[in-house]
Structures are given as structure tokens and as C-alpha cells.
């Protein structure tokens, strides 16, 4: 079938050619989960070392059965926005459970973590307000900030002195202010300095939104990055996902009852999106049960990350995310291909996901990995890096 728009085809072809020249074209490849940390690609079995399924719960029998039971009881889909048809009982149960788990009055579940961050900020601030966002915060935090219509100022990564200077200068001339950051940064694995940030927010009357997508389940006893500090902190807006450590799908924000009520009316990605299917909610509830009950499960990804870093002589990790910075995009792709040849799935992460000249292997640790998997990954990667260095 021939496209009706030749100019569109030329545009796409030219853009793709440019991406190819810079080793930046993205491709998707069929990959079949085999259970645990194993996947199959092109007929070969690989150890998956790049998934965000940190606790392996997407493959846990209890989580799978809970998803199936919810679908049998409530159906395959939700049919409409919650504001049109209401929500099934499991959805309200999950929101109450998440609020209690995160130490807030209320919670609101969205269709995904990305949608949650597109929803929260534009519902709370706009023209005449100002947003301060960490330069390495997730793309959806930046997107939500831009959508709001507020002034957006980007501060250097985790630089509280720079943030303080910006707050002192700019906060007094704006009506409301927000500070946006990841709790655990998805590409670097480091944590935001939340106590210092919260102190600045208190001093300058700024509302702090923490994206804890990569914290819940594995950091701070499972409660997330807010509990990684002593004492723990309670930001007014705690966002997260159901799709990583919880092994399901969806996003949420935990906040006060009034703030959540306001979002129910003003958050467009909630108002105008069909609610999550029952299976996703049932799976998330079962996953939350396991996280609350099993401390060994929660701690295993960090234990494996530490083991890996010790073998390679790397610094102590802050999270189950360990980046190996390669720099050059072509070299990162080559290292990823060599790991795949050796039986490991570790995708090369390239711009614009990460800054230019910081292409990397983003290695993540899963409770389903064995110690033997991690030891072999470390020794294989060490050999690949040494060979590449010798060839320079």
C-alpha cells in the first residue's frame, strides 16, 4: 500500500538516515519472558540484566494469579474514565493501601507513571507560578512542567546550593513554586538529597514532587527513597509506578486528601483516560502484599548490586541501578552486542535518554538473578571493557 503523503515519507526517511549516521536509531526486538530473570531472543536464552522488574514480581505465581482472578471477577477492561463509570472495588483498595504504605492521607492511581507526571504539575500550577526541576529528572517530569504554562527553571543535578540561589532570586516574584526531582535517578542510580531539598522547600514555600518510580519496593525498606534517610521525609507529592518493583502497570500519586480531591477534578490524564484494567490492580495488590511481608525479597536486588560492584571495583551502589558509562554511542552498542553474545541482555542507553557523550550500559539487578549470574556478568563485562580499552 502506497502512502498518500510523499512528503511525510521523505521527512521520515531523512530523519532516520540522520539517526543512523549518529548511531541513535531505536529499534524494538521480540523478546519472550521465560520466567525468573531469563528471556528468549532470536532463539537464544539470555539473562535479563536491564529490566526494571527489580523483585521479579511480574513472574511471581501469586501476582499472576491475582491478575487472573481480578479479570475473572471484574472483566478485562474498565470501560471508561473513573469519573464516568466509577471504579471497581480493587482500585479503591489499592489507593488506600498505597497511601498507608507511603504515609499519606490519600492516593490517586493513573494509567501509567508517565501519565501521572503529565497530570500532577499542570493541575496545580500555571501562568504566574515557577517550577524548579533537576536537569536529570525523568522526561515526564520535564514534560509535565512544560505543559503547565508556569515558568520552568532547570537546576544542575542534585546541586542544592544552585537550587537555593535560584529560590532566593526567583521565588519571591512568583505566586506558587514547585520543586521536581526523581527520588532514585533512573539512568544513574543515585538518590536525590531529599532532606536538604525538603528544608529548602520549607524555607521558600515550594511544593515538592518526588518521582519515586525506582525507589518503591527496593529502597528504604521498600517504602522508597523517602525512607532512605534518618529521619525519613514526607514530601507533599509522592509519585510512583506500579510497573517496576510491583511488576504490574500504572502510576500513582500519594498526597493529602484535599490535594488528591483537587487532582480528581483537574488532572486531565485522569479525567480523560480509561481507568486501569482490573488485572493490573489485582497484580499490584498482590505485589504489595509480598513487598510488605518479605524483607529478604526487598533486600536482594541491593545485595546483588553490591556484589557486582565489589567484583568490578566500583563504588558502593545507592540502588539496584548501576551505570557503566561508555561515552561513545557506537562503543556502547558494541559492548551491548558482546554481552548478548555472552548470554546477557543489557541494552545500550544513548542520547537523548542520557546526555551527549554519556552513552552507557544500564545494568539493573533483579531478585530472580542468581549469584552465579551476577558473577559471570561482572567477569564478562570486565573482559569486554579491558579489551576495548586496550584497542584504543
Swiss-Prot record:
UniProt-annotated binding residues for substrate: 26, 138, 353
Listed EC numbers: 2.3.1.47
Annotated positions of the N6-(pyridoxal phosphate)lysine modification: 244
Domain of life: Bacteria
UniProt pathway: Cofactor biosynthesis; biotin biosynthesis
Keyword annotations: Biotin biosynthesis, Pyridoxal phosphate, Transferase
Cofactor: pyridoxal 5'-phosphate
GO molecular function, one term: pyridoxal phosphate binding
Reaction(s) this enzyme catalyzes, per UniProt: 6-carboxyhexanoyl-[ACP] + L-alanine + H(+) = (8S)-8-amino-7-oxononanoate + holo-[ACP] + CO2
Residue sites binding pyridoxal 5'-phosphate per the record: 113-114, 186, 214, 241
Major enzyme class: transferase
Gene Ontology biological process: biotin biosynthetic process
Protein family membership: Belongs to the class-II pyridoxal-phosphate-dependent aminotransferase family. BioF subfamily.
Oligomeric and partner information: Homodimer.
Function comment: Catalyzes the decarboxylative condensation of pimeloyl-[acyl-carrier protein] and L-alanine to produce 8-amino-7-oxononanoate (AON), [acyl-carrier protein], and carbon dioxide.
Protein name: 8-amino-7-oxononanoate synthase
Record lineage: Bacteria, Pseudomonadati, Pseudomonadota, Alphaproteobacteria, Maricaulales
Gene name of the encoded protein: bioF
Amino acid at each position: 500500500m502506497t502512502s498518500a503523503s510523499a512528503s511525510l515519507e521523505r521527512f521520515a526517511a531523512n530523519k532516520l538516515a540522520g539517526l543512523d549516521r549518529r548511531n541513535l536509531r531505536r529499534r524494538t526486538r521480540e523478546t519472550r519472558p521465560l520466567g525468573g530473570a531469563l528471556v528468549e531472543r532470536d532463539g537464544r536464552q539470555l539473562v535479563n540484566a536491564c529490566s526494571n522488574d527489580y523483585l521479579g514480581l511480574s513472574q511471581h505465581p501469586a501476582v499472576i494469579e491475582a491478575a487472573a482472578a481480578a479479570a475473572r471477577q471484574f472483566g478485562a477492561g474498565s470501560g471508561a474514565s473513573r469519573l464516568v463509570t466509577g471504579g471497581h472495588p480493587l482500585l479503591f483498595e489499592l489507593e488506600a493501601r498505597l497511601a498507608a504504605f507511603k504515609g499519606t492521607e490519600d492516593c490517586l492511581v493513573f494509567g501509567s507513571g508517565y501519565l501521572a507526571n503529565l497530570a500532577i504539575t499542570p493541575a496545580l500550577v500555571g501562568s504566574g507560578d515557577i517550577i524548579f526541576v533537576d536537569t536529570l529528572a525523568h522526561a515526564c517530569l520535564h514534560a509535565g512542567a512544560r505543559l503547565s504554562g508556569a515558568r520552568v527553571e532547570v537546576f544542575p543535578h542534585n546541586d542544592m546550593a544552585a537550587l537555593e540561589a535560584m529560590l532566593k532570586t526567583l521565588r519571591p516574584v512568583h505566586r506558587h513554586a514547585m520543586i521536581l526531582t526523581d527520588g532514585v535517578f533512573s539512568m544513574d542510580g543515585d538518590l536525590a538529597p531529599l532532606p536538604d531539598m525538603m528544608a529548602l522547600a520549607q524555607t521558600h514555600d515550594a511544593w515538592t514532587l518526588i518521582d519515586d518510580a525506582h525507589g518503591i519496593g527496593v529502597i528504604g525498606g521498600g517504602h522508597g527513597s523517602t525512607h532512605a534517610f534518618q529521619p525519613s521525609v514526607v514530601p507533599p507529592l509522592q509519585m510512583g509506578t506500579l510497573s517496576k518493583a510491583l511488576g504490574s502497570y500504572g502510576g500513582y500519586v500519594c498526597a493529602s486528601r484535599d490535594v488528591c480531591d483537587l487532582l480528581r477534578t483537574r488532572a486531565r490524564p485522569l479525567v480523560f483516560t480509561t481507568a486501569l484494567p482490573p488485572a493490573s490492580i489485582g497484580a499490584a495488590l498482590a505485589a504489595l502484599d509480598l513487598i510488605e511481608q518479605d524483607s529478604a525479597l526487598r533486600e536482594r536486588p541491593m545485595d546483588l548490586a553490591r556484589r557486582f560492584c565489589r567484583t568490578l571495583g566500583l563504588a558502593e551502589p545507592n540502588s539496584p541501578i548501576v551505570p557503566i558509562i561508555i561515552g561513545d554511542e557506537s562503543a556502547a552498542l558494541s559492548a551491548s552486542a558482546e554481552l548478548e553474545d555472552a548470554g546477557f541482555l543489557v541494552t545500550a542507553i544513548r542520547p537523548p535518554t542520557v546526555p551527549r557523550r554519556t552513552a552507557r550500559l544500564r545494568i539493573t539487578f533483579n531478585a530472580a538473578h542468581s549469584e552465579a549470574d551476577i558473577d559471570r556478568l561482572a567477569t564478562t563485562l570486565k573482559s569486554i571493557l579491558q579489551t576495548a580499552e586496550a584497542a584504543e
